[in-house]
Amino acid sequence: MHVDDCAEGIIFLLENYSDLPHVNLGTGEEMSIKELTEIIKSAVGFNGTTEFDTSKPNGTPRKILDTSKINNLGWHSKINIDRGLSDTYVWYLENYQ
């Protein structure tokens, strides 16, 4: 989740929600490590190969939050992972090169 979406989601909840229990903020989209790797490679222009060691544990089988509560309140994330990573990389190049 992009920090801008996170900040907007928190402000939205402060203005529109005062109940219990908790509310999850997120994109509501699940992604594999391989998919994330491909997006990062594209964002930074890496054309090499990547290798995955399938003998290692893969951690939690599902890595997604249920965002239906905040979505039903009318809030949805706006910045997808492709744009967020691309923007972050451009910012990095402009500020640290």
Locations of the language-model features?
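C-terminal substrate-binding subdomain of Rossmann-fold SDR/epimerase-dehydratase oxidoreductases
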Residues: M1-Q97
